[in-house]
Amino acid sequence: MVKFLVIFWFVVISFSHVSAQVCLERSGFFTPNSTYDLNRRVLLSSLPLNVTAIDGFYTTWIGEHPNRAYGLGMCVPGTDAHSCSDCIILANARLLQNCTNQTEAIVWRIDRTVCLVRYSNRSFYSSLGMEILRSDNYTRDFQANLTDLEITWEALMIRMIDQASYLYYAAGIRKLETSISRIYGFVQCSRDLSLQNCTKCLQQNVVEYRSCCRGRQGGIILRPSCFIRWELYPFLGLFDNIRPRQKDGKSISTGAIVAIIVVPILLLALGVGLWKRRKAYKTKTTKIADDITTSGSLQFEFKAIEAATCNFHNVNKLGHGGFGEVYKGTFPNGTEVAVKRLSKTSGQGEEEFKNEVFLVAKLQHRNLVKLLGYAVKGDEKILVYEFLPNKSLDHFLFDPVKKGQLDWTRRYNIINGITRGIVYLHQDSRLTIIHRDLKAGNILLDADMNPKIVDFGVARNFRVDQTEATTARVVGTIGYMPPEYVTNGQFSTKSDVYSFGVLILEIIGGKKNSSINETDGSISNLVTYVWRLWNNEPLLELVDAPMGENYDRNEVIRCIHIGLLCVQENPADRPTMSTVFHMLTNTSITLHVPQPPGFVFRVRFKPNPLADRLQRGPSTSMSFSCSVSVTCVSPR
């Protein structure tokens, strides 16, 4: 473990407000008002808005080496935006006031909610920080049965750590056997950790409890990467919807704890034995459902899906995606959903189905379409999504009439929203996720025209230490796929960057990437067309005519520039999506001069209809609004 000197330790202790702040020497010091200090202040000021906008968790960096500042902000998932923002603002103020020249500092603030703010001159993302920042037993000794307290406390912690191993946080209540008292507990990990390291950090806090806080009525243990807190009273409003785990009058003993562990294992073994004896039809259904271990609570009854879609009536059909059809469904309570029915004949169907459920069920971000659940029945595999009324982006962008609804403000907002969504997939989600099929048809629009990324059927997740991979099966949409993926099957986060670059150019120009008829009679793709404009002709010729002159010229030119940087032939020359986000939101960042992009061509021939269909690829339109009404009549 790296040893370091704690320069400043600030602790405020009360029953309503707990915080711990540490300014660290290990990374050195900076000169006040230096470039690093400025970057640090800009970084901290960006956290309150971005943390609340991106599901309560945000990582970023500002500046260039050696003055780059890395930062992280986090609130408990589900915290209302106002409380989260206030907590981050107060944490920032504490750091700026007390860590005047330390290049690294951490603060956990626990007031009306829990928040974490951290900055450094080095990248600490995904690193496990195990130094104890604070270990306090600031309440009185427990006066009743200590054995009961110990058993109940450890049982509660085991359950919460298990839940945090896939959610990064957990709150719980457990009643003592020998008194009316209840233990209220809360655990939280920094969401940049791997799930394995989250569990490891929390388990070490349990070990620390035994040496610092055994027998106390309450306490808190804080590390850079995680913390635990427990009390004999509810705190932070975390327990309003939680019922005590142990019923009144029921004892919990060592034998009971063992039973809790052993019985499910025995039942699982018995279930596996029965599972192997079932008919093939039942076997396949159970296999898929059992594989999706993280999403059991999301399962719908297949009959309920049939009823909601009028038995998949054609009038409810919204569109056709890469691996199946999409229908509109309406449940008896009036809730509207989009139902994706995977094709039975697709050789990729089952794999893609499980992949999508595994990935999407773990993702929570305002720029991603929310997966509500799934259903399986034999060969039938169903995904249920939130219903978005405004169709997909391509229905507006490439329609000569509807594109008029997309002024520059809306288009710029769509570009920024897509950027945030991909940054979350690549960097801020629990796994590094590569979409591999980003296109206008996979960007849905909500009622306010905010973008939401959909269709994770071909998505791939990476290990933390993995940067690229190779596939023998190239999937996606021609025109959006980068050269290294088409020719060699190599993909990485830079594959999505390429697709995003094409998408930016389509959004600005209102033109499909598939083919552009140039003035000299030749045919090229959109990337080639924009590259020619960049070198020889007015760049703003690209701007979609319906926007007229009502746009910010500098914003448009900068977005075109970023689009060209994203479609560079060499993946190493493309920026990361995090860098793209900073390029869009910070105009002081100087952009590099782009080199010729990948797939630049110019050929004189007439378009081939078949090739044109291949170039466009399948498009999912999950929000198509059908004007025909159908009444489902159920038999009496």
UniProtKB/Swiss-Prot annotation:
Gene Ontology molecular function terms on file: ATP binding; protein serine kinase activity; protein serine/threonine kinase activity
Which residues are listed as membrane-spanning?
Answer: 255-275
Give the chief site where it resides: membrane
Residue ranges of the Gnk2-homologous domain?
Answer: 21-124, 130-235
Family annotation (PROSITE patterns): GNK2, PROTEIN_KINASE_ATP, PROTEIN_KINASE_DOM, PROTEIN_KINASE_ST
Positions the record marks as coiled coil are none
Q: Where in the cell is it found?
A: Membrane
Q: Which UniProt keywords apply?
A: ATP-binding, Glycoprotein, Kinase, Membrane, Nucleotide-binding, Receptor, Repeat, Serine/threonine-protein kinase, Signal, Transferase, Transmembrane, Transmembrane helix
Residues given in the record as ATP binding sites: 318-326, 340
Residue intervals annotated with topology Cytoplasmic? 276-636
UniProt keyword ATP-binding, yes or no: yes
Q: For the Protein kinase domain, which residue ranges apply?
A: 312-585
Q: EC class of this enzyme?
A: transferase
Q: Which residues are glycosylated?
A: 33, 50, 98, 101, 121, 137, 145, 197
- A Pfam short name: Stress-antifung
Q: Which Gene Ontology biological process is one annotated for this entry? A: defense response to bacterium
Annotated signal sequence is 1-20
Q: Which residues lie on this side of the membrane: Extracellular?
A: 21-254
Which protein, by its recorded name, is this? Cysteine-rich receptor-like protein kinase 24
Q: Which gene encodes it?
A: CRK24
